[in-house]
């Protein structure tokens, strides 16, 4: 291959890009609907729930970190965090050695809400989970999505994947199942 030549065709690139776009859009529609139904009784929207979850797993974070790991604009992270603060779920602070960044921490009230939501999670009401159940039943495990994780690592960086993995490890290590509900150990 000559310098500057690509080892893929434009047609191949288009088909791949369109496949990812269509699959992502279809998957997101299901994820969004399921997520909204799950958190609706608690008067939260997806961004607010995501911010609470990130703040919980990071044990405090800057607004920039919330934006990065929540895949949202900094102003979106700030505005929704402000609403959560007004409801008593988060507190804002500045660090002595870093006055430029605003930090948030989940409050006891915010943690209680998040834990209650985790207890209320019902896999039967999750269409993506139910869609993957046949694969688990056949192969004995859920898809691990390693190719998707690799793509996201190349787009967002290793830090993004590390935080994502840490949140899942936190659930694995710090929660147990009791009466078909997820509860903190």
UniProtKB/Swiss-Prot annotation:
GO annotation terms (biological process): negative regulation of DNA-templated transcription; regulation of DNA-templated transcription; response to stress; sporulation resulting in formation of a cellular spore
SUPFAM superfamilies according to UniProt: Winged helix' DNA-binding domain (SSF46785)
Keyword vocabulary terms for this entry: DNA-binding, Repressor, Sporulation, Transcription, Transcription regulation
DNA-binding region: 63-86
Stored InterPro entries: HTH_MarR-typ, HTH_tscrpt_reg_Hpr, MarR/SlyA-like, Tscrpt_reg_MarR-type_CS, WH-like_DNA-bd_sf, WH_DNA-bd_sf
Pfam families: MarR
Alphabetical list of PROSITE patterns matching this protein: HTH_MARR_1 (PS01117), HTH_MARR_2 (PS50995)
Ranges of residues in domain HTH marR-type: 13-157
Protein's UniProt keywords contain DNA-binding: yes
Gene3D superfamilies with a match to the protein in the record: Winged helix-like DNA-binding domain superfamily/Winged helix DNA-binding domain
Keyword Repressor applies: yes
Listed GO MF terms: DNA binding; DNA-binding transcription factor activity
Function: Negative regulator of protease production and sporulation.
PANTHER family attached to this UniProt entry: DNA-BINDING TRANSCRIPTIONAL REPRESSOR SCOC, TRANSCRIPTIONAL REGULATOR, MARR FAMILY
Subunit structure: Homodimer.
The protein's name: HTH-type transcriptional regulator Hpr
Natural source organism: Bacillus cereus (strain ATCC 14579 / DSM 31 / CCUG 7414 / JCM 2152 / NBRC 15305 / NCIMB 9373 / NCTC 2599 / NRRL B-3711)
Gene name of the encoded protein: hpr
